[in-house]
């Protein structure tokens, strides 16, 4: 002991003697600078590991370039030009907005004003990808039904369950009917599926991610959560990551454009809270290998969310009709939550979606309970406090009026037309279909023409398709609107391809140059800034 003390004293004296040559300020600053350098190196290493060395170096280079005199002003001016072009030549509705209340109420004139505004909308009947999922003569009766249901409950709010017991029951029945479609009757699901209605697919996804984060924090003590998604997963997962401070590990799709299970496995670590599979994914209409992802989730004891926002009211019926649909719901071991939109193929009013959980233990982590508020005790199941009971009633009316037979009939029509469109696209020289579509989304690209120029020609013919990237492509989300005009779509598409082949190059007012440049631009931060500028100018 004495030897150790003696050694420590001699070490102290030697250190003091050595350090006595330095100014006190140096002794104070040196460890602080060393700490700063260590933190900078750690942050740089983390950025490289997360985004890649090339991306980090490019971002640093762009930051340095923007510091040069005049460069930043030039970039801002060019961004303004692009935003104006995206807004159809700079035309904005903000210049015609009503900004003050009328002095005297307009009474019934408001209906005339609304009709005038509505007349400015794009003619969506038949030529929009997705967007409106019912059309034709039967749509008028369907809209009338759900509008009447909405009007009966337009004053209700399920936040006040003690007052509006009817709406609470309607929501419970919508959730239960949906759970019955997605596996609650199968023993493998555990029979405890539960959930809530939300305002749309994004809120359902936000809640599933938040719930998984809190559940895994309670279960495993994870405080630096990470989730694994395929690059084809919906952008709502990035929104959830930003909202809830979750690190995203984005995995490239495999050669079939599906979630790469091996890539997912490589990303799993002690901070992983969840994985995401899509059925189908929005870009290409392909169902990820949910069973294999479920095996991973079970093996590593993490959550697995299945995004059924598009497929929830098609896949169960397509499977019954004999289409080769791979497993996608709670029948798959490892699936802990599912999101599905009623306002798409469920034909409910816009603003209705459902988030489901495997059991109540998981769902409890979705709720927010507040005990210290002077306004009393408070608990809310979803992100919104007040919710429109009219939308819940509209969803209930849509589902119960159509029934199993109605959904089966609709699914049969759109699945048949989807396959015809797929085959028709494959027959057009210069086009190819991406992957093997499982459902009603058909994505296609070209190796001989600029597909975005094709999109501009299609837009001039009244079609509204979705532009995709990596690879540059388009897709059409087939709905009941298209069942009677799919031949017109294929004819217009072939004519558009022929036009671009004969006269390559952008058309006046087209967006092909913007989409093409955005896809090739290496600085994704610049693209992000453009999107933010566009949104700020648009709303």
UniProtKB/Swiss-Prot annotation:
Leading EC class: lyase
MF (Gene Ontology): pyridoxal phosphate binding; sphinganine-1-phosphate aldolase activity
Signal peptide: 1-46
EC number assigned by the record: 4.1.2.27
Lumenal compartment segments: 47-54
Classification of source organism: Eukaryota, Viridiplantae, Streptophyta, Embryophyta, Tracheophyta
Domain of life: Eukaryota
Protein family membership: Belongs to the group II decarboxylase family. Sphingosine-1-phosphate lyase subfamily.
Function: Cleaves phosphorylated sphingoid bases (PSBs), such as sphingosine-1-phosphate, into fatty aldehydes and phosphoethanolamine. Elevates stress-induced ceramide production and apoptosis.
Keywords: Apoptosis, Endoplasmic reticulum, Lipid metabolism, Lyase, Membrane, Pyridoxal phosphate, Signal, Signal-anchor, Sphingolipid metabolism, Transmembrane, Transmembrane helix
Species per Swiss-Prot/TrEMBL record: Oryza sativa subsp. japonica
Name recorded for this polypeptide: Sphingosine-1-phosphate lyase
Modified residues (N6-(pyridoxal phosphate)lysine): 344
Pathway linked to the protein: Lipid metabolism; sphingolipid metabolism
Cytoplasmic side: 76-539
Keyword match rRNA-binding: no
Transmembrane regions listed in the UniProt entry: 55-75
Cofactor(s) required, per the database record: pyridoxal 5'-phosphate
Any Gene Ontology CC annotation: endoplasmic reticulum membrane
């Amino acid at each position: 002991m004495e030897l150790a003390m003696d050694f420590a004293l001699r070490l102290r004296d030697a250190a003091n003697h050595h350090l006595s040559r330095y100014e006190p300020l140096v002794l104070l600053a040196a460890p602080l600078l060393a700490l700063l350098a260590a933190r900078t190196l750690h942050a740089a290493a983390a950025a490289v590991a997360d985004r890649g060395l090339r991306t980090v170096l490019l971002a640093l280079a762009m930051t340095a370039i923007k510091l040069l005199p005049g460069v930043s002003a030039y970039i801002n001016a060019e961004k303004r030009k692009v935003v104006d072009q995206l807004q159809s030549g700079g035309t904005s509705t903000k210049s015609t907005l009503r900004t003050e209340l009328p002095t005297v109420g307009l009474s019934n004139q408001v209906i005339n004003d609304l009709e005038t505004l509505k007349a400015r909308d794009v003619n969506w009947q038949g030529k929009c990808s997705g967007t409106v999922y019912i059309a034709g003569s039967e749509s008028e009766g369907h809209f009338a039904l759900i509008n009447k249901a909405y009007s009966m409950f337009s004053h209700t709010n399920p936040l006040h369950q003690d007052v509006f017991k009817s709406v609470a029951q309607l929501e419970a029945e919508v959730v239960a009917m949906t759970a019955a479609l997605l596996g609650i009757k199968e023993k493998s699901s555990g029979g405890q599926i539960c959930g809530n209605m939300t305002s749309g697919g994004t809120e359902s996804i936000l809640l599933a991610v938040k719930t998984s984060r809190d559940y895994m924090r309670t279960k495993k003590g994870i405080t630096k959560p990470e989730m694994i998604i395929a690059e084809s997963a919906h952008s709502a997962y990035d929104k959830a990551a930003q909202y809830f401070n979750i690190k995203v590990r984005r995995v490239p799709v495999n050669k079939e454009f599906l979630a790469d299970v091996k890539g997912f496995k490589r990303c799993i670590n002690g901070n992983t809270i969840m994985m995401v599979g899509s059925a189908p994914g929005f870009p290409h209409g392909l169902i990820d290998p949910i069973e294999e992802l479920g095996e991973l989730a079970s093996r590593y004891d993490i959550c697995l969310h299945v995004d059924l926002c598009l497929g929830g009211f098609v896949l169960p019926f397509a499977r019954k009709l004999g289409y080769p649909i791979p497993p996608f719901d709670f029948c798959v071991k490892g699936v802990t939550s599912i999101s599905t939109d009623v306002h798409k193929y469920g034909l409910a009013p816009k603003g209705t979606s459902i988030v489901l959980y495997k059991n109540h233990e998981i769902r409890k982590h979705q709720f927010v309970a507040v005990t210290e508020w002077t306004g009393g005790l408070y608990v809310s199941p979803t992100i919104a406090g007040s919710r429109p009971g009219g939308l819940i009633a509209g969803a209930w009316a849509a589902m119960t009026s159509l029934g199993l037979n109605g959904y089966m009939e609709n699914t049969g029509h759109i699945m048949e037309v989807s396959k015809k469109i797929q085959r028709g696209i494959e027959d057009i020289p210069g086009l190819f279909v991406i992957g093997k579509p499982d459902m009603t989304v058909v994505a296609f690209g070209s190796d001989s023409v600029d597909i975005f120029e094709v999109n501009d020609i299609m837009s001039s013919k009244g079609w509204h398709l979705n532009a995709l990237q990596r690879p540059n492509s388009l897709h059409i989300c087939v709905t009941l609107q298209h069942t009677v005009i799919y031949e017109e779509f294929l004819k217009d598409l072939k004519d558009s391809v022929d036009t671009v082949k004969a006269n390559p190059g952008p058309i006046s007012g087209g967006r092909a140059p913007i989409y093409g440049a955005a896809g090739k631009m290496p600085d994704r931060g610049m693209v992000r800034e453009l999107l933010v500028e566009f949104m700020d100018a648009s709303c």
